[in-house]
Design a protein with these regions (language model features):
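Short beta->alpha connector loops
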Residues: 28-31, 90-92, 115
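Adenosine-phosphate binding glycine-rich loop
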Residues: 112-116, 120-165
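Conserved N-terminal Rossmann-fold NAD(P) cofactor-binding segment
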Residues: 54-72
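Short amphipathic alpha-helix with an adjacent loop that forms part of the alpha/beta core around
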Residues: 70-80
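Residues in the short beta-alpha loop(s) of Rossmann-like NAD(P)-binding domains
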Residues: 51-52, 115
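A general structural motif
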Residues: 20, 80-81, 106, 130
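ADP-ribose/adenylate-binding Rossmann-like module
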Residues: 83, 88, 99-124
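Segments forming oxygen-rich coordination pockets for charged ligands
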Residues: 1-50, 58-63, 82, 96, ...
Length: 165
């Protein structure tokens, strides 16, 4: 959320601008496009990270980061991001992305996947009580289109951001 505070005092003009909320998206398939659009409507800053970025699906993102090697993510500084979603649909890739994110101070880490695989992830990474980890990702709003999934993900992130969940 971009918030601006303006005041005029002693013949001086002061303006404080709060940094926009930042969303880090892992994966660049067709389903990511709707998430970027929805995040843009929320005035969030979006960054997409992937091994082979599919630019036609992510051209509305603010920043694109293409990794040369998957393991490069483990050495990146992710501390400037508020939230992240893992949408790569590859268990090996998802596990490495999650490992990198768990070393960050992010308030929201969401992962797409089926309930069985998400139980495995929670068990394997010891995430049963981690309040910032959401998997399967998104609120259950009953939709299954890319747009409805994007809405459910952004709604969950917004609820977490505002202390509702």
């Amino acid at each position: 959320d971009e918030v601006s505070f303006i005041k005029f005092e002693n013949d001086k003009f002061y303006q404080t601008i709060k940094k926009p909320y930042s969303l880090l998206i892992f994966g660049s398939g067709a389903h990511v496009s709707s998430l970027i659009s929805m995040a843009n409507l929320m005035a969030w800053e979006t960054t997409v990270i992937d091994i082979n970025i599919k630019e036609s699906f992510v051209n509305q993102a603010d920043t694109l980061i293409e990794l040369e090697n998957l393991e490069d993510i483990l050495t990146m500084d992710l501390s400037t991001y508020n939230a992240s979603v893992i949408l790569s649909h590859s268990p090996k890739t998802d596990d490495i992305y999650l490992k990198a994110l768990l070393n960050s101070n992010m308030n929201y880490i969401g992962m797409m996947g089926n309930k069985k695989n998400m139980q495995r992830i929670k068990q394997e990474f010891g995430l049963q009580n981690d309040k910032r980890f959401f998997a399967p990702i998104g609120l259950d709003i009953g939709g299954n289109t890319h747009q409805a999934i994007a809405l459910s993900i952004c709604s969950q992130i917004e609820a977490r951001k505002n202390g509702r969940i």
